[in-house]
């Protein structure tokens, strides 16, 4: 490692315009000695060389290095090193990440707030950490942040804090940063009025908005964002926010092409078994306007809650079922999801899904990835599925317990046949025994 670092330093020094290489025969041995001494004196390195080194160092190492000399301390405060920062906040000594020191937080707010552009807050499950994050947010008044991310590493701690406190802190940022382009505020108490402030100040710059599991945002609130933020390219939301009006707004001729739409489908109320449907015409309008959009859907529903879905053609490209899904729903996928490229089924029960799987292979011509767990598929049907998909099936993750031996193929034979059709060595996944 030390040799590699020295080699890297030599390359940097040799390429530096501030360090001229000695010509053989042109200097006395004394001059050469002074030159070597200068090269070995890291305190005399040009600013841009030290800056490049600092960019590879973790913050704590950078801070230690800044105490070497005045020159390095000056580089430590160069704005380029403070464009991106992640505040880490926790209340537990057992946490896997260290909390950002309070003195450093205050130094950043006082000296580098104006330089911050890409800011994230990583908090643990405690409400105190979420409140501390909001306390920092409310002080970022002299900055122009472009990217904001609020990350809860465990349960959504932002949802447990005072809604008014959170909204107040977020509003300060929305008002003072007028060039926000990417925002991740999932699992937070953000509401419609604060989104209106976001739109009023950042409608021309917003490109990405991730706000799944925000219970205080209505379908009208997200519609306001779509109507005014014509440059929005990526959007993540819950299904209850999705509406025909929203899809039509995203399909407006003045709106840029949408690139990524993520939809989390889960019960918003205990006992809810009915969900609103989206008209096929609305989906068609979106695909006509944005033909390359990835429509990603995550389902966290029970079988009886899924009756509404996939009765008509749906342009989903990536589909994940986090709970058990019925044979009937899987059968609809092959008939009504022609754009499907990735399918993950966590469970299906004890019903064999041979027919459904082959139907998907026959009609979903773009399918490149499949994951199955806690399902049952006969070895013959699985091999036929792989044969129909062929080498375009680049990701195939199947638990060994899913495959049921039949009269034609045994578990010992299946990997050879599957490998032949995939054009690469393949084995089913095996559950570890520990």
Curated annotation (Swiss-Prot):
Main location: cytoplasm
Pathway: Protein modification; protein ubiquitination
LRR repeat intervals: 187-213, 214-239, 242-265, 322-347, 349-374, 375-400
PROSITE patterns: FBOX
Keywords, sorted A to Z: Biological rhythms, Cytoplasm, Leucine-rich repeat, Nucleus, Repeat, Ubl conjugation pathway
Any GO CC annotation of this UniProt entry: nucleus
InterPro entries documented for this protein: F-box-like_dom_sf, F-box_dom, Leu-rich_rpt_Cys-con_subtyp, LRR_dom_sf
Source organism, top-level taxon: Eukaryota
GO biological process, one term: entrainment of circadian clock by photoperiod
Compartments, as annotated in UniProt: Cytoplasm, Cytosol; Nucleus
Every F-box domain range: 39-85
Pfam families assigned to the protein according to its UniProt record, in alphabetical order: F-box-like
Subunit (UniProt): Part of the SCF (SKP1-CUL1-F-box) E3 ubiquitin-protein ligase complex SCF(FBXL21) composed of CUL1, SKP1, RBX1 and FBXL21. Interacts with CRY1 and CRY2.
Its biological purpose: Substrate-recognition component of the SCF(FBXL21) E3 ubiquitin ligase complex involved in circadian rhythm function. Plays a key role in the maintenance of both the speed and the robustness of the circadian clock oscillation. The SCF(FBXL21) complex mainly acts in the cytosol and mediates ubiquitination of CRY proteins (CRY1 and CRY2), leading to CRY proteins stabilization. The SCF(FBXL21) complex counteracts the activity of the SCF(FBXL3) complex and protects CRY proteins from degradation.
Name this protein carries in UniProt: F-box/LRR-repeat protein 21
Species in which this protein is naturally found: Bos taurus (Bovine)
Lineage of the species this protein comes from: Eukaryota, Metazoa, Chordata, Craniata, Vertebrata
Gene behind this protein: FBXL21
């Amino acid at each position: 490692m030390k040799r590699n670092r020295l080699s890297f330093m030599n390359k940097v020094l040799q390429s530096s315009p501030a360090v001229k290489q000695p010509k053989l025969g042109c200097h006395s041995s004394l001059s050469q000695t002074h030159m070597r001494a200068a090269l070995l004196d890291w305190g005399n390195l040009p600013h841009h060389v030290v800056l490049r080194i600092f960019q590879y160092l973790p913050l704590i190492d950078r801070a230690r290095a800044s105490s070497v000399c005045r020159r390095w301390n000056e580089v430590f405060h160069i704005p380029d090193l403070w464009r991106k920062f992640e505040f880490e906040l926790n209340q537990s000594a057992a946490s896997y990440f260290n909390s950002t020191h309070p003195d450093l937080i205050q130094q950043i707010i006082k000296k580098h707030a104006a330089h911050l552009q890409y800011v994230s807050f990583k908090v643990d499950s405690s409400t105190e950490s979420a409140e501390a994050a909001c306390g920092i947010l409310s002080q970022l008044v002299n900055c122009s942040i472009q990217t904001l991310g609020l990350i809860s590493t465990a349960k959504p701690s932002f949802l447990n804090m005072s809604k008014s406190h959170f909204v107040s802190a977020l509003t300060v940022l929305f008002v003072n940063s007028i060039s926000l382009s990417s925002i991740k505020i999932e699992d937070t108490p953000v509401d419609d009025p604060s989104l209106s402030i976001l739109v009023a100040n950042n409608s021309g710059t917003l490109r990405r908005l991730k706000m799944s599991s925000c219970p205080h945002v209505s379908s009208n609130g997200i519609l306001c964002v779509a109507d005014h933020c014509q440059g929005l390219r990526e959007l993540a939301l819950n299904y209850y926010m999705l509406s025909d009006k929203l899809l039509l707004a995203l399909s407006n001729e003045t709106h840029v092409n949408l690139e990524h739409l993520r939809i989390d489908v889960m019960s918003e109320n205990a006992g809810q078994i009915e969900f609103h449907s989206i008209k096929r015409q609305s989906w068609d309008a979106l695909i006509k306007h944005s033909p390359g959009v990835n429509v990603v859907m995550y389902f966290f529903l029970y079988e009886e809650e899924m009756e509404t879905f996939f009765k008509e053609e749906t342009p989903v490209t990536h589909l994940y079922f986090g709970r058990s899904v019925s044979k009937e729903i899987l059968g609809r996928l092959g008939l009504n999801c022609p754009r499907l490229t990735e399918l993950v089924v966590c469970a299906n029960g004890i019903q064999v899904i041979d027919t459904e799987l082959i139907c998907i292979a026959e009609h979903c011509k773009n399918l490149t990835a499949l994951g199955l767990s806690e399902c049952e598929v006969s070895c013959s049907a699985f091999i036929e599925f792989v044969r129909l998909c062929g080498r375009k099936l680049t990701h195939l993750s199947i638990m060994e317990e899913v495959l049921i031996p039949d009269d034609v193929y045994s578990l010992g034979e299946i990997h050879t046949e599957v490998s032949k059709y995939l054009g690469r060595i393949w084995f089913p996944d095996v559950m570890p025994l520990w």
